[in-house]
């Protein structure tokens, strides 16, 4: 019997089972113990293969692919700390609803806890974060193939969001020529190999039904809060709210067109919050709200009913309102709950939103990150997409810009970490094939610098803007101790990215004014390559501009 040959047949069943659940993208890191899985993936023509040498970046690459494709994406890594590097992407997927499959190779049981090299306790290492965890036995013909494939099917059939961890121990030898070992074991699955359906088909989960009293509530004074959703859903939500005559507070990730722009500015005005107190119902569509003032209002509002609609399970309401948690696809829910044409009931808020935007426009000429956030719409590629980093940049865009309705926007706003942002952007571009504008801060770029290797392989123009304000200037907005702020919070690195771009053979620009920035964009959108645009700005200007605008708008 050939151990290496049967390892590969066992792995081939696992990989083929994944294809029955929509897996097309598979991300592979180098490793020896994962050889059976890697070779099985390489031999399966259903997969699009992606490789990366850094497992943490690999996880975020898969996350980006899953964001766009809306399908589960698989990863293959070797044993040891390579597995632990997938943790951040797994956590993010659990919070934002992407589907990830972690295929982690492992040493066999007799090599665990005995000093063997690269052998750690992998089963259960991700605690409660996976939706489902499977610790497979060592490959053996004593276990029928139908058990293996149905085990995979059960885990993936019940996967609606988050990750599945499949731990796969393999004994040596891992290499060798294929022979007939295990062929009859594999063939007992019969015509499943020619079919395209799972061996075990799980019934779909139940979703929230139509709210029978909707006809009553739609006649009341309501507010629509739009969180993270798809571009198509964003356009539908905007029309739905407009028909109802309800004010729509749109997050940067809502893709609604934010008809009442600069919400995180005007929500700091007492006239706006006073008017919103008249709302009898708040319907929040989508989660992951960004703006600080929006979150403060959301926490303090007390309507008669607060409904949250999202297809991700869980409460999704840190304010713990009395109301309804409705698990449903947003577009489907809107169809079940049609709007009734009514006149807008808010008078003060549209005026404040217009005045807030005019205050922002009055400051747009200076060359800084707040102004870039406002101008970002001017630089979006046609038929393209936007990827927004975390920390200060996403808050500035949320507060100061007005993104077009239905324009795809992606971000990692689940756990909101700055790790893996460039890798995620790479996955977003690969899955869509669209021109992509990505914008991150300097610390975020440093954190994931080796992901520039992934950005060498793009199918359409990708522009990465690195806003270099020399540190974590988000902490300038927080009451951090002045005496310790720079050393322990901002942590300025005093670096530039020209040589990093050159190392990975990426185009690079460092504009000094808006005209040079526009010229750099015009050049970048012409060719299907990656261009790094480093925008060096005064360190505290962005945070100070936001604070000044907040003070100005609060007194309108």
From Swiss-Prot:
Record GO biological process: menaquinone biosynthetic process
Record carries keyword Lipid biosynthesis: no
Pathway membership: Quinol/quinone metabolism; 1,4-dihydroxy-2-naphthoate biosynthesis; 1,4-dihydroxy-2-naphthoate from chorismate: step 2/7; Quinol/quinone metabolism; menaquinone biosynthesis
SUPFAM superfamilies named among the record's database cross-references: Thiamin diphosphate-binding fold (THDP-binding)
Keyword line: Magnesium, Manganese, Menaquinone biosynthesis, Metal-binding, Thiamine pyrophosphate, Transferase
Free-text cofactor note: Binds 1 thiamine pyrophosphate per subunit.
Cofactor list: Mg(2+); Mn(2+); thiamine diphosphate
InterPro entries in the cross-refs: MenaQ_synth_MenD (IPR004433), MenD_middle (IPR032264), THDP-binding (IPR029061), Thiamin_PyroP_enz_TPP-bd_dom (IPR012001), TPP_enzyme_TPP-bd (IPR011766)
Protein EC: 2.2.1.9
Catalyzed reactions per annotation: isochorismate + 2-oxoglutarate + H(+) = 5-enolpyruvoyl-6-hydroxy-2-succinyl-cyclohex-3-ene-1-carboxylate + CO2
Enzyme class name: transferase
Presence of keyword Metal-binding: yes
Family: Belongs to the TPP enzyme family. MenD subfamily.
Subunit description: Homodimer.
HAMAP family, alphabetized: MenD
Name of the protein this chain belongs to: 2-succinyl-5-enolpyruvyl-6-hydroxy-3-cyclohexene-1-carboxylate synthase
Native source organism of the sequence: Escherichia coli (strain ATCC 8739 / DSM 1576 / NBRC 3972 / NCIMB 8545 / WDCM 00012 / Crooks)
Lineage of source species: Bacteria, Pseudomonadati, Pseudomonadota, Gammaproteobacteria, Enterobacterales
